[in-house]
Amino acid sequence: MALLPILEFPDPRLRTKAALIEAAEVTTPAFQELIDNMFLTMYDAPGIGLAATQVDVHKRFMVIDVSEEKNEPHVFINPEIVAKDGGRVYQEGCLSVPGIFADVTRADTITVKYLDRNGQEQQMEAGDVLATCIQHEMDHLDGKLFIDYLSPLKREMVRKKLAKQRKHVA
């Protein structure tokens, strides 16, 4: 297994819309290894979710584990939200936008259809942090970042803060 490099804003590859995955690809050894590497990368970061587009793989899947013990891994392949309910503000962060946190309003509960890592169709109802994380990671698959929900002024402040952080690292 190997850690994968995580793309960071403003990298234009984060804006690429991910392609659907053929069911036959899901069970291939190469795809299974990619899933394992994404979990390894997410846990190492540390994070609670990682979309394939964040590691420069433009396919519609993501890995998530919101448990404290990191023992409830979920793989969502070709996810599709089929129902939403309520609205709630959560403070979000992102491995591709390091050190930045902002309040984002999302559906409080969702129902999502997807393929699991074995290529089996699944449907899950999710609430709270898991629902927020699924919606956040699905945005990545459509080339959208949580900072896109911010006003243009706040988004520009984020861009400047990240540029300043990069200067200090270099």
UniProtKB/Swiss-Prot annotation:
Extract the signal peptide range: none
Q: Which Gene Ontology biological process is one annotated for this entry?
A: co-translational protein modification
Question: What detail does the entry give on cofactor binding?
Answer: Binds 1 Fe(2+) ion.
- Top class in the EC scheme: hydrolase
InterPro entries attached to this UniProt entry:
Peptide_deformylase (IPR023635), Peptide_deformylase_sf (IPR036821)
Q: Which domain of life is it from?
A: Bacteria
Among CDD domains, the record links this protein to:
Pep_deformylase
* Co-factor requirement: Fe(2+)
Question: Known PANTHER family for this protein?
Answer: PEPTIDE DEFORMYLASE
Q: What is this protein called?
A: Peptide deformylase
Which species?
Stenotrophomonas maltophilia (strain K279a)
Gene symbol of the encoding locus: def
